Amino acid sequence: MLNEAIKEVLSGKDLSESQSEQVMENIMNGQESSALIAGFLIALKMKGESIPEITGCAKAMRNMAVPVKLKSQYAIDTCGTGGDGGRTFNISTAAAIIAASAGVKVAKHGNRAVSSQSGSADVLKELGININLEKSKVEHCIDNVGMGFLFAPSYHSAMKNVAGIRRDLGVRTIFNILGPLTNPAFVKGQVMGVYDRKLLEPAAKTLLNLGCERAMVVHGGDGLDEITTTTVTYVCEVKDGEIRKYTLSPGDFGIKTTFYKNIAGGTARENAAIIMDILKGKTGPERDIVVLNSAAAIYIGKKAEDLKEGILRANELIDSGKAYAKYEEILNYNN
């Protein structure tokens, strides 16, 4: 089947959603050779992944994931595609903790570093969080504490069939896009960063196809898969079954534009130290970018009416010590 799919894609045709779902199912089940999988991934990348292709592949991966069952009716994720080459510290991970302190239920889906020095799993481990917590405890932690970490390899075991191929190819493929779209808790809210502005609308439409209620799909004008503070950010917002496009600027919220070097990260240990400083109230550009991304998570988590209120809440939670207290609560539950 993959042979035929490659021929179609090479001729410039888009695969249907059902074709894409079947192809991804075969890949995940180990039914296709490494050479064919690599050929398919590169052919798809060269053509450009269509919305039906992304949706079908995401559905296959979601169907094969170990499901996380929450009592909470509404939970969110703060997860980007990565692959932006930005090498910032783990902004969305810090934002997840602050959003949880606002009362948002956060099912943080993530992995170890692929192209950066520190993935969400790496930095959470440095922060003392058990990234291999058993599923029932993660479910309880999200429902009762407010945030739990879903370590991707534990919930998408079939990914082992493509891990080596992705590593050998060394280029971004559809799997970069699929990571944030395949949260095993099937969250209804999402702040999703993408590495390419062209992916904003396809990602937003795919989220709608997958039943997402609220989302902000974001891409920084500097290339970051976050809401940035160095320049404008492009946004596709999903709300009430519709997609709205707009741009954000740090100045819109009274935040000073900064230089990239001021939000750069390092090793997992260095990034954990930056996050700890922010949670303890340190001010500066690193806090500014975390507050802006936390505001988005609080807004998508339905705990603020808009981003401006989200920023006020994020700052209050940090300054009052509630954000750090939430981190300690998560830490204590995980150990």
Curated annotation (Swiss-Prot):
Pathway membership: Amino-acid biosynthesis; L-tryptophan biosynthesis; L-tryptophan from chorismate: step 2/5
A Pfam family recorded for this sequence: Glycos_trans_3N
Positions annotated to bind Mg(2+) 2: D225, E226
Coiled coil: none
List of residues binding 5-phospho-alpha-D-ribose 1-diphosphate: 80, 83-84, 88, 90-93, 108-116, 120
EC id: 2.4.2.18
Reaction equations catalysed: N-(5-phospho-beta-D-ribosyl)anthranilate + diphosphate = 5-phospho-alpha-D-ribose 1-diphosphate + anthranilate
Enzyme class, spelled out: transferase
Entries under SUPFAM superfamilies matching the protein: Nucleoside phosphorylase/phosphoribosyltransferase catalytic domain (SSF52418), Nucleoside phosphorylase/phosphoribosyltransferase N-terminal domain (SSF47648)
Function: Catalyzes the transfer of the phosphoribosyl group of 5-phosphorylribose-1-pyrophosphate (PRPP) to anthranilate to yield N-(5'-phosphoribosyl)-anthranilate (PRA).
Family membership: Belongs to the anthranilate phosphoribosyltransferase family.
Record-linked HAMAP family: TrpD
Assembly notes: Homodimer.
Name the record gives this protein: Anthranilate phosphoribosyltransferase
